Amino acid sequence: LLSNPNDIPGMITHVLPIHDRTCLPPLTREEFMSDTELIARLFPTEGIHACEEVGKVRLPVDMNKIASLHEVTLRMEHVKIRYGSRTILKDLDWEIKNGEKWALFGPNGAGKSTLLSLVYADNPQSYANTLYLFDRKRGSGESIWDIKKRIGYVSPEMHLYYKENVPTLNIVGSGFFDSIGLFRKCNAEQETVALEWMKVFGIEHLKDRLFLTLSSGEQRLALLARAFVKDPDLIILDEPLHGLDVSNKKKAAAIIEQFCDRPGKTLIYVTHYPHE
């Protein structure tokens, strides 16, 4: 099942269109791709979540947040990651200055997730490498929580980490504590901010719905809201639009762009699609 005609793999020869829970007549790949009217009907670009509404939304701002004065958000020097006899990363140098926006491309298995795990303090081999985050060398006394509190993160795998069926508002609020699940209760101010971000992504009506009952697209929007609640200095988005329909892809992309236009916001964006 695909939500974007451009995602159809090259080896596919036939397509079964589905519209309004009804299977339409099957088509060859060529017939389907040439039927612009059908594609427009299956993948509408307008609707209640259309991106033009985003400009009218005021993104929440943490008025108590002190602007970060760091110069370099990330610097890696000759990084090497190895598991057994397999080398994942070798002699990698990478520097991201405060406020820069980076796109990270590469096929599955190229080492993107490993690279991100170093940045997000989830890889123990980071201590065996020369790595700086926010002008501070890893292993110089900071905890992983000191690092995570300045980073917003979402990835396709995050869906798999949530096994407890809790209200969606709890999932969004867990972003304040960098936990999988809500082990600490949000205060009133944090809950208000979480609800504001849910409203930005158009899912405030889902706040009391159990997370595991949501569609995959609704879950993705909730996890995106979770990534933004802290007003992070660094936002890491690993295929953030995966699983969204066309209109919500546009909406989410516009929100990301609007957030990253703020001074001092650094972005690492992982995607398979250059147009994103």
Predicted regions, residues:
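Conserved beta-strand-loop-alpha-helix hinge in the C-terminal portion
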Residues: 21-52
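Conserved structural motif at the start of ABC-family nucleotide-binding domains
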Residues: 74, 88-91
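ABC ATPase NBD Q-loop/coupling interface
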Residues: 130-146
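Conserved ABC ATPase "signature" region
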Residues: 173, 188-206
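Conserved ABC ATPase signature
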Residues: 186, 210-214, 218
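Hydrophobic anchor residue at the start of the ABC signature
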Residues: 224-225
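Catalytic Walker B motif of ABC-type/P-loop ATPase nucleotide-binding domains
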Residues: 235-239
